[in-house]
């Protein structure tokens, strides 16, 4: 009888504990290729060199994505925790009949959203009054002239929210500087 209660309590504790946690989701090679293609298309359009995939940056991005999914909250990491890395964030959630529907290409979806900020972007130095009322920082990080590497990662919260984090090296978005 005592063993049964111990097992039941242990199972309930484990279940409660796992509900509080997010989890890593490995991106497919196809999704990585598509996301990188979108980044490089944006860069080529403005006359920049392409950037390369970095497993190291992807691993760093995964740590932060896991943190966001565990807390079920989106916010940027501190500059101190990601020295010499830029960061783009994306959040997604959709459901049908109360069940989450996951994106088939989350890194591609995020990259397209960041790229589409070009619609509002007016070429100027970062932080210019020309762009102060629009969100363009994800796009400018994608096309920052000195950036050479990117890594992207995905984590899901227990309720199905998807958190996508991209890390860039060297970082961009320096006040008073042109992105390209």
Model segments located where?
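Bacterial Sec-dependent signal peptides at the C-terminal "C-region" and cleavage site
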Residues: 11-26
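Sec-dependent N-terminal signal peptides
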Residues: 4-12
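Intrinsically disordered, low-complexity regions enriched in Ser/Pro/Gly/Gln/His and often acidic
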Residues: 6-7, 46, 57, 106-108, ...
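Short, well-ordered surface patches within globular domains
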Residues: 23, 27-86
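Short gly/Ser/Thr-rich phosphate-binding loop of adenylate-forming enzymes
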Residues: 89
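Disulfide-stabilized extracellular recognition modules
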Residues: 93-180
């Amino acid at each position: 009888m005592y063993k049964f209660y111990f097992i039941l309590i242990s199972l309930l504790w484990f279940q409660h504990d796992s509900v509080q946690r997010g989890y890593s989701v490995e991106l497919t090679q196809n999704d990585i290729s598509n996301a990188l293609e979108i980044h490089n298309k944006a860069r080529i359009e403005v006359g920049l060199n392409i950037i390369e995939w970095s497993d190291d940056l992807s691993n760093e991005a995964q740590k932060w994505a896991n943190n966001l999914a565990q807390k079920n909250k989106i916010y940027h990491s501190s500059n101190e925790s990601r020295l010499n890395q830029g960061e783009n964030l994306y959040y997604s959630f959709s459901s049908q009949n109360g069940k989450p529907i996951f994106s088939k290409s989350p890194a591609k979806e995020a990259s397209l959203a960041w790229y589409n900020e070009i619609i509002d972007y007016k070429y100027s130095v970062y932080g210019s009054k020309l762009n102060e009322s629009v969100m363009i920082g994800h796009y400018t990080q994608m096309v920052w002239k000195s950036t050479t590497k990117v890594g992207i990662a995905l984590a899901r919260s227990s309720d199905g929210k998807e958190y996508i984090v991209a890390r860039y090296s060297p970082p961009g978005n320096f006040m008073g500087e042109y992105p390209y």
